[in-house]
């Protein structure tokens, strides 16, 4: 038997639907009825319908009403009539909206919205009224669909935050309609055909179809779960469609969100051999469920012809003309492909130093940093976004006072560099004096003069050895000093931090003390977003020779590649993960570690130096986002001991899972080249962190035998963009506000804290209202479990005194926090890094 629905379509008749509807009517009246009696009523309804032809939905519902009243169930029949009327009203508003837009297929989307968002505050009647206020004569169907989405966006408030999910569904529907028309117009059907088309147009890397068969692509297409689009907020989906999916050269999106996730998974699983389709599925599920986000360059560039997947690079600038310009050239090439940069200037001679014996000839680091600044502005990724670079200088460098005023608004503009991000490398001695004797003298010196006079580079040492040599230099009258007090430097640092948000802080002794690969090198600085801490070494010129090849004169320059650091990043979306489920977390971390390891081998490198370092150390940086989201969902206040205990446990679990996954990967694919003698191999890594439990001791023994696949594992990036994609809070930061309006291209875009509700409301305390000591203590607890560093911001208000800000720096240093990113004053807007947005 078939029944004709209101849209005219005939479908199989399902009598259980009548049973369920009547049961709901009885339940709604608080009337108990047994299954036997209900089945008798159903049988009577069916008997009376037997002669009905054709059978329609309205005819069935009329018969249910009549049968209920015949049996004396008048109140239930009345409730059923009211229920029908309510459903009819819901259908009418859906029909009206769909008809106004001119898209009949929209009705099903609206029906799902009514089913999933049942609270009165999400009534489609409100949407209809707002939408109709935007409609104007002569609008196209696409313009009306856009107006409908805009209406849902504007209905988003702190009291009705789920409108951002409704807006996302409407945006996704209109996008999918346009996308289907685009492919229909190109005469392309299945996924393989679309990938072939994109490849032929130079929009998709030909390596994907070269590695996968037609049958494998068809299998991958079956992995797609379009319903996961419903996980997007409007902000996340809008960002993804504008910046992450593949677009034609006329900026028309040609890839759905789920196809984007699948394309990334296909790329990252390419080298997995016969088992690759299993890993395609795991990578796709991890990404499409928004449990893990890859860094912005990986999300944007995986599957494309120029697949530069790394976020950040770090270079050690040599103290020579050739070396400095080589570093500038390296930065330009990195910036061209969307990478951010960290540059260590601690080896470059200070202003007034000698050049080839000529006194006072050197111009100092500021002149070179201004060239870096201009390069960042000039190399702007096809006009999309200017380059981004952090420049690091040691706290004892003679050019430090001028360096600390690079971005301030007062002083000589010829000594400014407003488009770079300055950062200072602090030894323990500096903070110890700031804490114990802030009026103590502090001596600024030129690294070139020290090397010339003493025969060693002071910046090549750390800890007690650095202190011993620093005092040796201070007491050597042959070395010129620029003597100030610690207080003078602290004042300059804090004044700049409050005014500009910078300099970033790099605690060099804390970093090197916990470096698991200290046996092969030293860490001089961090990257653009202060989460990377890996061994560094400058590129060295060896020789320049002239050869004749095939009758042509060829100039060959030989260089020693040094250690040019590369950051391959991803983030666990803690707000979207069951962090208490150890098995689930271990599986998720294992999948993410494997994906990051594959990035190393599948990456397109803008520089050979980067490729060589990355393949030698195989360093990765798995971090987190959704930290505040995670706490709020569990009813944990930021300013509480419960927060501190919880974060300690969660990050120990993440670290354990990461080390366990990495050593298993080493057994399968081989250990990194410099494993022998590392803290991993000797067990010092585990001892330094106090990992003494039975399971940690067992894991340490396994690591010593099997090795580690990657030299560095964990690094917490800011995730400013990718956290929006996954609908969670950024990095380890507290939220800025529960709800606010962001101005974007002339319109106001609502931003809502993740899963904001009456249950989470009181656990979302705004960043600037939080006692920052709690944030610092939490960072110290996390740092124990993170072998690299974390992008940790300080949030201050205008009420903070300089002494209070200094106290936070000192607390962070004492807690073992390796780096501090921005100092975000409430009155200050600072630019987020997009490269490290994992």
Regions found by a protein language model. Name each.
Residues 180-274, 357-371, 383-387, 392-527, ...:
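Conserved, charged catalytic cores of large soluble enzymes
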Residues 286, 328, 588-611, 619, ...:
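Internal maturation/activation junctions in enzymes
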Residues 213-225, 229-238, 530-534, 596-601, ...:
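Catalytic alpha/beta core of large soluble enzyme barrels
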Residues 9, 32-262, 278-284:
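Core nucleic-acid recognition elements
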Residues 6-13, 33-36, 101, 252-255, ...:
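Alpha-helix capping and helix-loop boundary segments enriched in small/acidic/polar residues
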Residues 14-32, 106-120, 262-269, 730-735:
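Short, surface-exposed, low-complexity cationic segments
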Residues 79-87, 93, 163-195, 426, ...:
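Terminal amphipathic helices with adjacent charged low-complexity linkers/tails
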Residues 246, 252, 261-276, 280, ...:
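Function-dense linear segments that define catalytic or interfacial modules
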